[in-house]
Amino acid sequence: MTILDAGRRLFTAFTVLTLLLPGQAVAAPVQKSRPVAQKPVAKPVATPAAVKAVAPKPAAGPQSTAATLAASTAPRPWFYEHSDVPMDMAWQFGVLPNGLRYAVRRNDIPAHMVSIRVRMDVGSLMEKPEEAGFAHFIEHLSFRGSRDVPDGESKRIWQRLGAEFGVDSNAQTSAISTTFAVDLPEASPAGLDESLKILASMVSAPNIVPQAVEAERSVVMAERREGLSPGSLLGDQTRAFYFAGQPLGHHSPIGTEATLTGATADALHAFHDRWYRPDRTVVAISGDADPAVLIELVKKHFSSWQGVGPTPPLPDFGRPDPAAQATKVVISPATPVSVSLVYLRPWIFNDDTIAFNQKRMVDDIALQLINRRLAVAAAGGTSFLEASVARDDSARSVSATYVSIVPIGDDWEKALKEVRAIIEDARRTPPSKADIDREYVVIENALAQAVATSSIESSAQQVDTLVGAVDIRETAVSPDVQLDIYRGGRKLMTPENVRDSTRRMFTGTAVRALLTVKSAQPTALARLGTAFRAPVQPAQNVRLGNKAVTMASLPPLGAPGKIALDQPLGALGIEQIVFENGATLYLNPNKAEPGKVRVSVRFGHGQQSFSPDENAALWAVPSTLMASGIGNLDRNALDELLNGRQLSLQFGIDDDAFTMDAVSSPEDYKDQLRLFATKLAFPRWDASPLARTVAALNVTYDPIPNSAGDALDRNVGWLLRDKDERVAPPEPSDAQELTLAKFKEVWEPRLANGPVEIQLFGDVKRDEAVEAVAATFGALPRRGDMIPPPENRVRRFPAPVAQPVVLNHDGSNEQAGAVIAWPTGGGEDRIRESRQLSMLARIINDRLFEKLRSVDGAAYTPSAVSVWPEDFDTGGYLVVQTQLKPERIPYFFTFVDEVVADLAARPVSADELEREVEPMRKYLARARASNLFWMSQLGGMSRDPRKLTMARTLQDDVLSVTAADIQMLAQRYLRANTRWSAVVVAKGVQPPALPAAPQIADTATAPRVAASQNGPAQAN
């Protein structure tokens, strides 16, 4: 059971850690959660008994500890072989005569949805050197077309069924598997039948023909090109170093330029026939459908599939090589200086027993304990900004313990020594019982919360959990069983066992150290070897004290507030309660999410409390303000207070308000309210979190973005707001002026300003919830309200440019980007039009995908988005952008002009419109049943009562859009004389000449925008 991530809320590993782990899966990620330990993969045998589905009766209720831990004498289905963990009785398992394995279950969360996963036991580790990237290439070809589906038609079919490509239908390829995923929002019998037919055809008979290969080659190459970055290059070098001599070291799923360029239809077909076989396939389905019907559909569409030739043996994934190079220095100017250690051990199969899992839980406690000590040390001022440890059975190739360190400044030797000393202390000296109890309760709480919310676990989560478990030869259990097993292992979590676990995890048959620096250092390799091998003394004073921090440690608030107004809102059972101090509560007790309570607090005026020309360093606030503490409690004390509970401290800045949001529980939400209220009443000002925020900026900042994608991410949003300082990307020069005194001067009055609005939705009792708010926010003094000046409530769009603004990046010359944007509007008066603009953007987005990606392969991720700020009267825009090769930039501009002209000249077809409306119809039907949807729509209603009406009309505004509406919006807004554009090229590359934009003679109907007079500009 992988439970460490669920409990490690306190520790946020730096992105450097991701570089240590094996090759990133390519395409959309498939979430993995709650797998249990590893087991040998059982070779399916087609026998009469195997053909019959194993269909245990669903449990009547939560299984008791005794019942769930009792071993069953009945034959176990394929998923639970080699295991004594209690089976999740909701699943029904079976094996077809051809060896295909399946698992199905009924689940009505969300209602009417069915989630399907088809997992193929083939990934990049099955490729020969000359086949690098073939597994991923075939994933693309399978989605493109197959025996039963014409080229590109599967996407359109699923759109008509309400499934949005990239969200509801997608695929991923990893080192060890390829998984095809479809979530049908409203699964009719016909839609289910069609979807299983398409998926079966995809994996058994894709169109691997020269024409399709040539078309999709450009798409795969574009995906590879867009993924190139200093981080990805460092990841490749890291894996090659760590896993030297093993396939994992040099088998990235994306492949190489040479192998992708040289891939032929015959070679790809041979790879498919070798590895795409029914006996290497798992079909997992969960959803609002009869399991018997689902099983029959699996049999109907997959039974006739037969593998070509004998089943090939799996390649040998190798073992860590102790003789390989132990230290390495990588020069990477565009990534942070970092030090990474890895302790490698051979990966072996283990029977998936309760005892094995409970032993692993001791490992999790040991790692979490070290991570807490590292986090506390970093917060208190050390030579490292962040450090973390993690255990991973990487791609069934190694069992490894990873250490990642991000030093402050260039003194990486000191940072390495300090981190090793903290680990050494854990290796030598057993932790106290209080240390273990502190970590135990964190994981226990996370698992208990999973039990409390298990009735609303989505079908997509369930199939992803099962497929993820198969991926690494594990099983999965229900949340209550997982909690039982965890609690049953508590007796093993003794100080001596935790210490012994630490010693085992920080020992390996091969140990390696990697240093990443920004420039050449002739002595770095020798210094790394010395620092890595030097004996280390255990750290002193890193163990945490046992002083209890409770809610009583917080400063007291005043007397509970009195209610001035209590009335129903007239919608959804929401109640509006106004206290005498001006605080307003919107309360909706409901069971939509059992075990969850959502809390949202709004106050002040957000970005509008600052001038668009004022550099207020808003980027520093989320990571600094809450970490500064409350009253006399610093960050470490608050961590103790929050430990093992559904409590959090998060701060956000909206256009018109500051926010504090949390997802709590029925047991903890009252204390969550008190935390937020006390933060407003007794803010603490601490230099340490601010210093860490500044240090993080200095560590990660690059003067020039390191890729085209980075340049777009950093600059486009800021430039489309006409260089509004409130959203400006941070620079070290900004941080130099950011002192604690200045930070306090800016934020102390803003925390005290403006009436407070509280939303409380979820699993609460009405009277208790009202009392809790009265005792917290109702107890605050009445707050004044400084209304922002009119100039702060303006959002600008840049003036039109005759030639695109040129942005530079410092990456590959092959990487470029392009952006075209048109001003639209803002505010609430034209809210219906704003929502229909989003549908126009969806249609443009689909046309970009169909042409630039599917047909031409010019771009992998073209996009179109409409942004309409409801709280500003101006500043909205519709933007299209993409990454591509520099020489294709003129083509992008020409094609966008053609799309815009066509949309303005003629209505879209009924089918094209329906393929965009139907996914939105299904999405809104699901969203409107959620607390999160209504909270997001009604936020700010105490100041603007129109929010309720707008929320009620949202669905109709979106779904009633007509082809004539789309044409009118294109004519009104997508005009050459108002548009702004930019191109991104590598530093030193000359942008290509662009064709002249089409002229529109009539400018009388051009939209009103607040635009600056700035002309073309050059920016990094």
Task: Describe the residue ranges of each PLM region.
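Bacterial N-terminal signal peptides that target proteins for export
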Residues: T2-F14
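Bacterial N-terminal signal peptides
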Residues: T12-P22
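Proteolytic maturation boundary segments
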Residues: V26-V104, D290-M361, L367-A379, D435-V441, ...
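M16 family metallopeptidases and their MPP-like homologs
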Residues: A103-R105, P110-F137, G152-S201, S232-A258, ...
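Carboxylate/His-rich catalytic cores and anion/metal-binding grooves
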Residues: M221-P230, T700
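Conserved, carboxylate-rich catalytic/transport cores that coordinate ions
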Residues: H272, Q650, W747
